[in-house]
């Protein structure tokens, strides 16, 4: 796993590797390591600090940064050592289910006050019932995760239908969501407000985990990632509706992980050994010291003399 992660790193595909990490954590581990989102959120912050330390214009250079190699080596090792749980099944919503008059049998909430806790006047009234049922099912008194997931899919599906009909729904602005201002009106934040509010009603620790899940969900957020990252929401639902073992440590087998990290450069040497490079590789050398810069200029001059080629600046 560390080898293939290193391949992504060498290619500069950091967005892809973070998507894989979030997907695996939320779909295959979730309650097997319930505090894992806190760890990943901290590591994501560390990654951003390294990136903003001078690599924004050339992320490929980060592959030679030992901190980056160590960071992802540790993350992948922690994921591999975490206990795996059942995967979440996709819940399919029938077309008729979007007709409120035909799904009254699914409405179990004993009051309409639950949605009112987070509903804003700008939020679509069509989603009030869905949000109310969602909130009802994540309550401590109910803990019905499967039905809560159904209503999550119902809300996402309702948006999809509106798009097909060239209708656009947006909610009230939720400025507490850590995304660009133009995305703060997305209705998905209504779901997250329900999760955060209920988690806060339970315990500070649970609220911290939920906040970390939100931080991961919001990474470079655009509306298109909602479906791809929905298992982070499933994870959040399960935190509120399934038995939670707070004694599970985030990192197990620390010695094994330390051993892997200590040998992480071996993987990169193997990748370097197998690298297929053109003869002009020196043009793309990341370590441009004065000495090899002069050599590069000399070689370019020789190329120009032989071919009449004038390189663009």
Task: List each model region and its residues.
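C-terminal alpha-helical interaction modules of replication/initiation AAA+ assemblies
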Residues: 3-313
